A protein has these predicted regions:
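Acidic-basic catalytic patches of nuclease active cores, encompassing PD-(D/E)XK
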Residues: 1-33, 99-102
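Active-site metal-binding core of divalent-cation-utilizing nuclease and nuclease-like domains
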Residues: 28-40, 48-49
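Glycine-centered small-residue hotspots that permit tight backbone geometry or close packing
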Residues: 40-42, 213
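Short, surface-exposed beta-edge/turn micro-motifs
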Residues: 42, 52, 103-107
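Conserved catalytic cores of phosphodiester-cleaving nucleases, focusing on short active-site segments
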Residues: 44-45, 54-62
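Catalytic cores of nucleic-acid endonucleases
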Residues: 60-124
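Extended, basic/helix-rich recognition subdomains
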Residues: 123-250
Length: 250
């Protein structure tokens, strides 16, 4: 079935809610706001802000309601699904797994909403997070072959599967408990001081997964003279990983 909610519109409303309702920090802000300041700089409270990086890749979900829908036996009708890129199309999924292995919080985020009018209602009622599903790429694991693979789920059940060969996924996060689940996960890590040194290190980690050649990082860095370190990290997250980079406050 044709998608009625685009990744662009969903990504905007989800990010807006995480920032304005949950207090997450943006990393594409102008100089001097929240993320990205000189090492040792302090905020108005007298201490440099601290937090944890969060990578979100937005996935538009297909709404399946016909009786011949292939995965209906798993979760019933209607249901949602989103596709993972084949290996020959993109190494995107593997890159996200490698990013997760470096200790960063990484999720696919997808809506349990298929009509634009429902997305609008969720946006104004601040229910976008609650109407979403979050899946760790590492939970899905490496794709075993070049066949089409999809994540299948329903708005009425907590069961989530990865197909083509159906396998139930554990550890997925349904939106209503997302903020608390992320808070528990990052509580096990040391909060990072959100200064230029941190964002430059984060940028280096991202580039190293694309190419171990330091020259690539230097070339990318050459054009960021008028860009804060946090904005540059956000730029790399978007261009190299197709992700939104946010900061979960400590």
């Amino acid at each position: 079935m044709k998608r009625k909610v685009s990744e662009f519109s969903y990504g905007f409303v989800l990010t807006h809610e995480l920032v304005n309702a949950y207090g997450y920090f943006r990393t594409d802000a102008p100089h001097g706001s929240r993320g990205g300041r000189k090492k040792g700089a302090e905020d108005g409270a007298g201490a440099a802000p601290r937090g944890y990086p969060l990578f979100l890749q937005f996935k538009a979900s297909e709404y399946m309601k016909r009786r011949n829908a292939g995965e209906s036996k798993l979760v019933g009708l209607p249901y949602f699904r989103f596709a993972l890129h084949r290996k020959t199309q993109s190494n995107q999924h593997q890159l996200l797994i490698e990013l997760e292995k470096k200790g960063y919080a990484v999720f696919y985020a997808t809506p349990k909403i298929h009509e634009a009018v429902n997305l609008n209602s969720a946006f104004f009622d601040r229910q976008v997070v609650a109407s979403s599903l979050f899946v760790n790429p590492g939970e899905i694991g490496e794709l075993p072959d070049n066949r089409p693979h999809r994540v299948v789920f329903s708005g009425r059940s907590e069961d989530v599967y990865v197909c083509s060969k159906p396998q139930r996924l554990g550890g997925v996060i349904h939106g209503a408990v997302f903020a608390e689940a992320v808070r528990r996960a990052v509580a096990e890590k040391e909060a990072q001081s959100l200064d230029d040194e941190f964002f430059n290190r984060l940028a280096g980690d991202m580039v190293s997964l694309i190419s171990p050649n330091r020259r690539i990082f230097d070339e990318l860095s050459g054009g960021k003279v008028e860009m804060s370190a946090s904005t540059f990290a956000n730029y790399l997250a978007k261009t190299l990983f197709d992700c939104e980079l946010l900061i979960v406050p400590s």
